[in-house]
């Protein structure tokens, strides 16, 4: 193959690109030839929308304040804020691998969204770096690994407590100011390990070596992302996380009622006791089945069996009682049992709560949340599955399980970065797409349909002109989203 000559000015620093001609099937009498000499093109035109969301949230600016930069100020070419923007934009756009930035650093559109004034990189100090406006994979990697090390090559030090607090405060800022009831979903999941990472343990339930991260979501908004080793109880650290989360929520929304929702792995006396001691703080937590609980539910199970014999199908009967464990609970608590009998046989389930029977009311006596046992189980507790969908998006779309560094601290940093990128995409959907066809689209679908749009970038003294693909199917939606974000940023 013959190397294609780059004869336009924008190709001055593109001689390292792969420019060998690629031959495809003929199209009638014409040859079909392709190469990578297109110049200043980008496949991520939607990154401009992410830049607006970032500016509206002040996310990268706030996050950069959680790092201490020990580098010489006169030698810095990439500020911490620019490095974070580059990394977060890359994650949100689907470039979770740092090696992707080996070529992405020459993308002028990504450079513009990262805050680079010199989007072409022509003013770089070192001649061999000119044409690369953004940081290299090695520079980004040092920023992530500096969570573990402090030496000559790792001079950007994160303040880990501040990073976690910033994620929490950013998430709480995204909650509606007029909310009367907030539901906090806690859940743990597995993060498989394929090497000899620090904190590597085998987990019997998941049947593999893994980490056991703890997440907390309020609706679609992530509030907490904590990387933990798997040699612990699933609820370990939940009380400490809950105390921080409630404090930040109360500071912004002092009158809101909070419901903690979780599966049976979080039915721990310390968590429930603390909730019971706080004003307007409630819990709705699953209970694992045992012989005592099933014996208490047996009358309802018998009734359900009889009804199924008469009408077939699946029958549910709900029963409430007061229950206390033999050794681990300090007091008896309101317990709701679901006696379900279907084609597969008996399926008893249990939840424990301190939500009163009369429900939750505001100061005027208006009902905010029902207290009926059936409603609490079917309408409120079963919605807990949405948290699993959020974790799935965090894992599959933002690659939060890319915890492949050797050290636990740097893997925690990667988890946080994925959580911040998740927040960018979630806010793009909430602020820019509410009431549209993509208002409930998954983050992966949102990225594919709205952000992956071809763009040609022209740079002059006065402006950066981005020409988006004329055949883009969602042009009206893109423009509508941009207008909404611009209005929100200016308000």
Predicted segments with their positions:
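Dynamic "connector" segments at or just before major functional cores
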Residues: 1-208, 212-232, 239-252, 277, ...
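An anionic, glycine-rich sequence signature occurring as long contiguous blocks
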Residues: 2-9, 17-35, 282-396, 482-491
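Short amphipathic alpha-helical "interface-anchor" segments enriched in bulky aromatics
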Residues: 53, 367, 372-413, 417-429
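Acidic/histidine-rich, metal-coordinating catalytic segments
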Residues: 187, 256-267
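Short, glycine-/Ser/Thr-/acidic-enriched flexible segments
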Residues: 189-191, 221, 228-230, 288-290, ...
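A short acidic (Asp/Glu
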Residues: 195, 268-273, 294-298
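Short, surface-exposed basic-aromatic patches at helix termini and helix-loop junctions that form
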Residues: 272-281
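Basic, amphipathic alpha-helical segments enriched in Lys/Arg and hydrophobic/aromatic residues
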Residues: 400-471
